[in-house]
Every structure is written in C-alpha cells, then in structure tokens.
C-alpha cells in the first residue's frame, strides 16, 4: 500500500463518528453518504471462478488445478477470474446493485493443508503439501490482485487461518492442539508465503480454536504471528458467524459483547456475521477501545480506496466490459485447465487412448456420467453451458458410434427411484455393457457427499467422508460391470483420494478427472480418444483404506501425508502417467559442496518420447540424510513446468535456496544444518511405490552443506 492511500484512509476515518466506524466492520457495510462512501458487501467468492453471482466461467475445482502443478496456469486463471469479477462489479454498481457476492473482495484461495483424506472441504485446497499449496496459492493471488498494489483488480483472501481441516461436524467447538513443529512445518507455511511473497490483501480466521484460543480472536495467531512475525498489513476477516462461537460453543467468553471485543482487540477487522453489531455495547462496557476500532476501519477503508470505490481515486479497471464474462477465450482456458488437471492413474497394455475408428458402440455408465454436480465441486459459479462426460463423448464421436447411457446406481443411495427396488438401475447398466464394445464407467463423489458442514446433504458426517470407499452401491456396480467382460475405463470424478484398490487390480484404465469445471466432459472425452495426453500429477496421496491413518481429530502430522508416512500407499503424491514415455537423464549440480546458506541449482534433461505434446511438471524433492525422528523424509521443494513437443528434449534447472534445506525444530525454529542432503529430480516422488507404478527411477543427487547450523527466515 502507498503512503497516499494510507493517509487518505486515515483522513476519511478521522471524519467518522465512533458509531459510523463500527458500522463499517460488518460485512454488510452501510453507506456513509456525507463522506461519499458507498454501501459495500464484503462477502464474495471466487475459489475457481466468480461464484454465486450469476454467470461466470467455471474452472476446475481447486484440487484439480493443483494437479497441474503449474504456477503460471494458476496465475493466468486468477487473472481471468478477477477480470470477470471486476466486469460484473462495474455493471452491477452502475445499476445500483451492491448485494452479496457482487463485490471485489474475494474470499479465496483456501490454503489449508489437506492433511486427512476424510475432510470434506479438501477439494477446495491445493492438496496435502505445504510447498505446493504456497506456490499455487501465491500464483492465484497474484492473478486475482494484478501487478499494481496501489490499484488492485480485486482483493484476495487467504483462508482459513489457521490449523483448519476438519472435522466439519465439530468445527465450531473444536480445539486443534498442535505442536510448534507441526504448526510451522505444515500449517502456517502457505499463509506465510501468501503474505510475504504474494502480498495477499486479506486473511480469514478459522472457526476452530488453536491450542485453546479461538482463531478469530487469537492473540498468538493474529498479532504475534500474522502481524508481528509475518508483517501482514492487510485486513483480517472472521469466518462467517465464527465470533459468536466464542461464547456459544468454545465457551471462552461469557456473551456476544465479550466475543466481539476479543476479536477486535486481537486484530480481527471485519465480521462476517452479527457479532460486531454488538461493538457499541462492548465499547460502553469498556471492553474495546476506540483506538482498536479506528485501526481496523483504516485498514478496511484503505483497500476500498485502492480498489477504486472512492470517486477521487479511480480504478484503471472500471471500464472492463461485461462482454468479457464467460467469453470464448476464458471458456477455452477453462477447458485447457481441465485437460491439464487430468491424472492418468492406470493404463494397462496402453488401453488408452481409444481408437474411435475401431469402436461401434460405447456404454457410458455411472451416477457421474451425466451429472452437472460432478463437474463443479462447491463454491461455484453458474455456467451458460455444461458438458458432462456423457455429453462430451456423444459430441466427440457424433453419429458414427452408438453411445448408450445407463445411470447404474444413485451416487450414494441404494436406489435411483423413490418407489423403486434396491439396485433398480443395475440390470440396465449390465445390458448396456453387454451391447457395447467398450465401457466408460463414471464413478466417484460430488459436493453433496464431500463438502462443508451445513452444505453436504447425505448420511455422511456433515460433509466429511466416513471412509475412502466409493459410496453407496458404486463399488458393487464397478465389480458387476467389470464382470461382464468388456474393456472398462474408470473415470473418477471426486475432489479427494478414493480407495481404488479393487479397481487397480481389475480395471485396465483409470482416469481421475477431479471436478473438471462446467465443460469438463469435453476434456474427459478428448483424453479418452487421444486428442491430447493427460499428464497431471496427484496433489494428494491415495491410501489403501484408513486403517493406518491417525484419528481424524489428531492434528499431529505423524503418520500423515507423503512427508510423514509410506504405509499402505496406493498412488503416491506427485504420481501420474501419460500416453507414451517421458525420460529423465543427466541430473547434475555444480554445487556438490557449498556453504550452509548457499543456493544449490540442480539440472536434468527431460525428453518427451511420446507422440503427443506435453506439459511436464519436473518435481524436486529434498531430504536431510541425518533427519531426526519425527522430521520429514523427502519433501517437495521445487517445481518446473516445461512444455515439450513430441520427441523434444530440454534441459531444466531448479534453484534451491537455504530455506529449502531447512528443518523446523521442536520449538518452531527454522534451521539449516551442515551435512549431507539428498536431492531427487524427476517426474515423480522418489520411493518404491512410485517406481513400481511407473517403472522409472528418479535420479538422486547428494550434496554437502558445510559450516555451522544457521537460522533462516521461515
């Protein structure tokens, strides 16, 4: 922020009465006409496109975007999303519509860590790895906010601060107990990067407590860490109705006045909810100072000024046209993002791609074959057109191939029709399979099965999954259709890891499409028939069941994610196949020995030996050879996305900085130790399971750091 806008905000707030200041701290902020301040609603959503505000381009859900491992793509998508948001805001404002979801302060991205595959909101995140989450979160923020901090196109918000990833059912009362090691090693890293590197404008506090303190009123989180350690200068907003949880569920305050005061005094500037309507009474009771109120409102006015909401500080984006909303270029990018997000989990005997010239009939079967809900996930906008996998296949093959559809079963119930018998669509599915040359079986989840507390609508626990199996009758449908004996391709639509152990053993081809966006069925069809080669990578670990996972409520990282366990892994983090082969060779570094704080650059040659152009994500992992018990193994510390034409070879280099070699100590310190480090560079995570699935080894280099143990900035 500039000195000009900061002084403007101070001058503006100095003219407000105390009551006017307090009125601006609720998400439905009223106009102050005598000061030229228009009404504004701060609650706006843009997780993977402008959401809940009518028509907009609907991109793949965040977890699918994470599977691209591509920072450049995420920034480009963020730029498109804020362009559409700004275009809509411009037109809505001209017509006097300042309602909810029609503003410029977008409460995205979600940079929580998907630490447990049962968490219902995990598909809103960028996966289980702090480094990947930080890199992609920063890229999306840069795209949303634009290049000029004094004139942002929109304001992004990193959420939910902090240590927040389920269980959904008890999020309003839950106390996440976490060690300093895990706090800094896992839960805070992406937020730090969003603040320091991407200059995110806002941070949203979480519902839960962290080590006894409610997150939206935590001195430790909001003052000591966010403001003092991270140097955050933007505004803090509460999650919706989180502040009333202080007294109603957490029982750390006695009443709403105490709750509102605790939040405001500890640095929460804006309340999504009603608690701050009680700030006047809290002030009367001596619970909150005018200084705290003034500081909060100055921060809120400052970003509104920079966004161009005051007449004498115009925005360069105020003429963006509504014609840009869901324009062809934006839709094309959404489909390209869907293509880039597809992860090929299995392709036995090169079953894929299918040869349309050799197929006369295709059976498209499953509850997600023609489901719009399975395209979009949650926090989604409205598209003017949807293309499901069934529709994508029909459009691709045209009249040359007979496409038969059967729902097969309900997503999670035992029957489709209310008055029907159990398995009332099974026989139809079997008949369709029997009459087809090949079966495309579309199974998985949607946001009614995995989602947010209060939004998910079935028997699962308030949005969280009870386990990792396909729900309802889907597993039985999978086995029944496979038993018909026709070639089967399993297309998975889900925002999280599913236990596909049976499918891995019995189904020849498996494609994970995540929630691929409004027109994602087009990308699915093109992948199946070989218009392009899927080449996404898993941003989460796929486990064989939950037997070896810790309790869901245990926030220790021991036994969780690829960084802290290698037990019962079906598909590893960073894994993904493609059509043909990508080879790596000649890994090297010129800094085999270096000082503790020196950078290390690693290089490798990458060759596309397939017949398709590819975007390959080169993954770099680092491990300290003498790691102590409780410290992680190999960790992702570098990504390079390289575009390769068929047959093309390129040399790729990645520079690792001192922080990439650091470990977090028990007391939360960040240190680089002298000694030997292993660096893996390749197209996958190092390890036995990756090697077994791909048939490839990753090249591992050893470098030595010399000198004394050094502290580095977290």
Please state what every model-predicted region is.
Residues 1-665, 673-681, 685, 713-714:
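Glycoside hydrolase catalytic-domain context in secreted enzymes
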Residues 667-670, 690:
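Short proline/glycine-enriched turn/loop segments at secondary-structure junctions
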Residues 689-713:
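Short beta-strand elements
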